[in-house]
Design a protein with these regions (language model features):
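Sec-dependent bacterial lipoprotein signal peptides
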Residues: 1-20
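Ser/Thr/Pro/Gly-biased, low-complexity, turn-/loop-rich segments
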Residues: 2-4, 22-256
Length: 256
């Protein structure tokens, strides 16, 4: 292969690789479908029920703080409210589905919603403190986002409802190489792990029960083939750059 043909081959190689490593717009658009001015999608109602090893914040208060102080955990001093301090000061649901509250004792909470737990505790506490107010919050709502997102890691949400879109938003959204059609949701189950494949380009995802995340879920965003092609292009570029330099040196030596 003479010099002219060689350079032509190099040019065509880079041109072809660049074209095939480009990402079509259709691959990065969420919830694709026919464009409408307004669309209503009915969603499945999601209410989280407490599981073993969840962590709850339970606060029992009344106008007379001295009366209800005995019902609460002695708080560990902390200047900042963070997941670590809330873990220390929270109630961990044991494997039997119970939490152990001062004065009250063990109360079954597994299988109940936060509102139902609040009602149960109100009934117990108000037999002794008629004007008591009970606040129950879930503080172990954390999910892990991995793969092709801009800010992978563990993210916390202090709310009863946490959607896949909210989780991806907290992770900085998918990168340009995140495969919208290949989202893997890993959900811990008793005795194992449930794995579900989700497609962000499909509007029907909004109707799915998996649109709502649960504590300890792991979301993995797979890369597009274009990222692999890009990485291969970098390797090929380095190789051919070195090869081109070598050919030029050899031609220079031969011409002198």
């Amino acid at each position: 292969m003479n010099k002219k043909k060689y350079l032509r081959f190099i040019y065509l190689f880079f041109l072809a690789t660049s074209i095939f490593s480009c990402i079509p717009q259709k691959k990065v658009i969420y919830f694709q479908g026919k464009q409408k001015d307004s669309t209503f999608i009915e969603q499945e109602q999601f209410v989280y029920k407490i599981h073993p090893r969840d962590i709850l914040h339970i606060s029992i208060v009344s106008p007379d703080a001295r009366v209800t102080s005995f019902y609460n955990i002695q708080q560990t001093p902390s200047q900042n409210v963070n997941p670590g301090s809330m873990y220390i000061n929270g109630y961990i649901v044991n494997d039997s589905g119970m939490v152990n509250i001062p004065v009250i004792g063990k109360v079954k909470v597994v299988g109940y919603t936060l509102t139902e737990i609040q009602t149960i505790l109100e009934k117990i506490v108000r037999e002794q403190v008629s004007d008591a107010t009970i606040v129950v919050k879930l503080i172990s709502y954390r999910v892990t986002i991995l793969g092709e997102v801009r800010s992978p890691g563990m993210h916390y949400m202090f709310n009863e409802r946490f959607t896949l879109l909210e989780a991806l938003g907290m992770a900085g959204d998918l990168s340009e190489y995140g495969n919208r059609k290949n989202i893997k949701l890993m959900r811990p189950k008793e005795g194992g792990m449930e794995i579900v494949h989700l497609d962000l380009t499909d509007e029907d995802l909004l109707k799915s029960s998996y649109f709502y995340l649960k504590p300890n879920d792991v979301v993995y965003v797979a890369p597009m083939k274009a990222k692999i092609d890009r990485n291969n292009l970098v390797i090929a570029t380095t190789f051919f750059a070195g090869l081109s330099a070598l050919v030029l040196i050899i031609n220079f030596i031969k011409s002198n």
